[in-house]
Amino acid sequence: MDQRIIASSSTREDDAADASIRPKRLADYLGQQPVREQMEIYIQAAKARGEAMDHVLIFGPPGLGKTTLSHVIANELGVSLRVTSGPVIEKAGDLAALLTNLQPHDVLFIDEIHRLSPVVEEVLYPAMEDFQIDIMIGDGPAARSIKIDLPPFTLIGATTRAGLLTAPLRDRFGIVQRLEFYSPQELTRIVIRSAAILGIDCTPEGAAEIARRARGTPRIANRLLRRVRDYAQVKAAGHIDLPVAQAAMQMLKVDPEGFDELDRRMLRTIVEHFDGGPVGVESLAASLSEERGTLEDVIEPYLIQQGFLIRTARGRMVTTKAYLHLGLKPPRDRAPGIGEPGDLF
C-alpha cells in the first residue's frame, strides 16, 4: 500500500521536519495535560533527590508524540538521551553495549519495546530493577557469568501495542502514561506553532481547517501543514487562509472528517457489497485487495474511534453515521454509531 497523506506512521520527511519543530520543554509540549502535569512532578522530584527518575512506559496510537515526550523528559532532567528501538536490539550483547555506555541518570529510549526478543528481555529485567547485568563469558564448560554494575538510569519504553508487552516487563515500569488523541483546538495550537517555526504565513482559520482534518494526530497535522504550504506557494503566494486550506485538502482528497479515499472505499465496500455488514475481516480484506493487518492496524482504528465502524462477534458493520457521510440513506435497523461488545475477529 502506498504511503497515505493521513497515515500516522512516520516517514523520513516527518523525522527531518520533527527535528526542527520538536518541543524541548514541557511548557512547549502542547496537549496531553494530565501526562504533562504528572511528568512535571516526577521530573522535579527526581531532580530534587538527585536520583534517576523511575522507568517510564508510554503507549498510545502512532504519531501522538511518544518520541517527542522522551526528548522533553531528558531535556528537563538535564541528561543525555540514547535512542534505539526493539527490533534493532537483536542480541543480549547489543543491549549490554548500550547499557554500559550510559552515564549516571541518563535516559535510554526504546521505541517499539514490545518487539524485544525474550533473550534481550531477560537481560533487561535485572538492569531495570538492580542496575546490574549478567554477561556470559566463554563457551562450553569454561563459560562463566560476570556481573556488571550499571549507573542508575531511566528507561523509557514506547509502544503502540501495550497488550503485546509481557507482564514481567510491564510490571517493571514505575510510571505508565497513555497518550490520547488530540482535540481540534489542541491541534490548531500545534499547527500555529509549527507554522511560526517553519516561517509559514498561516491564519488561525487556516490552521484550524488543517487541524480538524488531522485525525487527532500531531504528526498528521504537521504533514498536512507542509503539503498545504506547497499548495499555497504555487497557488496563493505562500499565504494559507481558510479557502486555501480547503482547496488544498480537496486536492489531497482529505475530507472534513480526515478520511482519505481508502477510508471511504472501505465504508463504501461494506455498504455496497455486504449490505452494511456484518462482514468478516478476511472477506473484507479480499474485497479491498488489502492485507488483513492493513485493515486492522491502519484503517479501522480511526473509523471505530470516530463511530463510523463497529466490530461485533459476527464481523464489521458500518453505522448510521457512515451512511450519512457517504450521502446514503441508512436502513432503519442500522446502529447509530455506538460499538457493541465482543470482538472475535
UniProtKB/Swiss-Prot annotation:
- UniProt keyword list: ATP-binding, Cytoplasm, DNA damage, DNA recombination, DNA repair, DNA-binding, Hydrolase, Nucleotide-binding
Catalyses: ATP + H2O = ADP + phosphate + H(+)
Q: Name one GO molecular function term.
A: ATP binding
For region Large ATPase domain (RuvB-L), the annotated ranges are 1-182
The name this protein goes by in its record = Holliday junction branch migration complex subunit RuvB
Q: Which residues bind DNA?
A: R292, R311, R316
Q: What NCBIfam families does the record point to?
A: PRK00080.1, ruvB
| Residues involved in ATP binding | I21, R22, G63, K66, T67, T68, E129, D130, F131, R172, Y182, R219
Q: How does it assemble?
A: Homohexamer. Forms an RuvA(8)-RuvB(12)-Holliday junction (HJ) complex. HJ DNA is sandwiched between 2 RuvA tetramers; dsDNA enters through RuvA and exits via RuvB. An RuvB hexamer assembles on each DNA strand where it exits the tetramer. Each RuvB hexamer is contacted by two RuvA subunits (via domain III) on 2 adjacent RuvB subunits; this complex drives branch migration. In the full resolvosome a probable DNA-RuvA(4)-RuvB(12)-RuvC(2) complex forms which resolves the HJ.
Domain of life where this protein originates? Bacteria
Listed under GO cellular component are: cytoplasm; Holliday junction resolvase complex
Which SUPFAM superfamilies has this protein been placed in? P-loop containing nucleoside triphosphate hydrolases, Winged helix' DNA-binding domain
Q: Which family does it belong to?
A: Belongs to the RuvB family.
Q: What are the binding positions for Mg(2+) in this chain?
A: T67
Q: Which SMART domains match?
A: AAA (SM00382)
Q: State the organism of origin.
A: Xanthomonas oryzae pv. oryzae (strain KACC10331 / KXO85)
Summarizing the function annotation, the protein's role is: The RuvA-RuvB-RuvC complex processes Holliday junction (HJ) DNA during genetic recombination and DNA repair, while the RuvA-RuvB complex plays an important role in the rescue of blocked DNA replication forks via replication fork reversal (RFR). RuvA specifically binds to HJ cruciform DNA, conferring on it an open structure. The RuvB hexamer acts as an ATP-dependent pump, pulling dsDNA into and through the RuvAB complex. RuvB forms 2 homohexamers on either side of HJ DNA bound by 1 or 2 RuvA tetramers; 4 subunits per hexamer contact DNA at a time.
Region annotation (Small ATPAse domain (RuvB-S)) maps to: 183-253
Broad class of the protein's primary localization: cytoplasm
Q: Domain comment?
A: Has 3 domains, the large (RuvB-L) and small ATPase (RuvB-S) domains and the C-terminal head (RuvB-H) domain. The head domain binds DNA, while the ATPase domains jointly bind ATP, ADP or are empty depending on the state of the subunit in the translocation cycle. During a single DNA translocation step the structure of each domain remains the same, but their relative positions change.
Recorded hits in InterPro entries, A to Z, give: AAA+_ATPase (IPR003593), AAA_lid_4 (IPR041445), DNA_helicase_Holl-junc_RuvB (IPR004605), P-loop_NTPase (IPR027417), RuvB-like_N (IPR008824), RuvB_C (IPR008823), WH-like_DNA-bd_sf (IPR036388), WH_DNA-bd_sf (IPR036390)
Tell where it localizes: Cytoplasm
